[in-house]
């Protein structure tokens, strides 16, 4: 989350008149993240999160907001969009589509234990199962087509070795594309900073604005790449086992998913290496912005390329 579009207290106070949330008492920009403008909002009725959407349009946004509303009703601890007095989940503020959602308790974790990985695996599986009955459809905006376009854009900035790695992995992933894996709604960005923990467990899952329809296993791989890395690209086998075992307890993997796992881990690493390269070399102007290091995911991709045998058995 970042601040690209400034909002003053006066502007927000006027905007909030169309909501039954009481009077504004505090407004603070959130600097983490890279996609949207976000603020902590405090009113006389409690805390909320305000988001101004910098890329997504008013045509695209109903999928995400309705999905969060649906998952919240299904017991998934995610932000619940607040309706305006006109019963709309989406408004306009300072020329940008905007929404305000419930504030969830907890904090993101930096020191990860197996127990937390297990909790994340369980909640991800429950979200996948709940999403099977959601009628909305959204093609992955960061899928293969985007990978190829983004790769062409960032390629001139890369060293020869990085160019070779990127090109070879793209060609590999093109050959791996298949539709025989279980599909459904995926979060597509369930990193450590998007899961909030309280003293009793997970308090919330946030940032659903990359959610889409894709292979459920791909979502598990994206999650594993961040939650199970030791920080230098190396995967922690114990954490990986805890994550996958807890996931499978809620949604057992199919026979088709087992052999696809190594390629999915590589796909998840490639996708975020590309997006971080793009944001690093082609940043957007912002009042408060947060760049993320592309090397983090390049190292993870290289690890999966050279250490496929260390992947834990999903059947264990």
UniProtKB/Swiss-Prot annotation:
It catalyses: L-homoserine + ATP = O-phospho-L-homoserine + ADP + H(+). Pathway: Amino-acid biosynthesis; L-threonine biosynthesis; L-threonine from L-aspartate: step 4/5. PANTHER family: AMINOGLYCOSIDE PHOSPHOTRANSFERASE DOMAIN-CONTAINING PROTEIN (PTHR21064:SF6), AMINOGLYCOSIDE PHOSPHOTRANSFERASE DOMAIN-CONTAINING PROTEIN-RELATED (PTHR21064). Belongs to the pseudomonas-type ThrB family. Its EC number is 2.7.1.39. GO terms for molecular function: ATP binding; homoserine kinase activity. It comes from the Bacteria. GO terms for biological process: threonine biosynthetic process. Disulfide bonds: none annotated. This is Homoserine kinase. Keywords: Amino-acid biosynthesis, ATP-binding, Kinase, Nucleotide-binding, Threonine biosynthesis, Transferase. HAMAP family: Homoser_kinase_2. It is an enzyme of class 2 (transferase). CDD domains: HomoserineK_II.
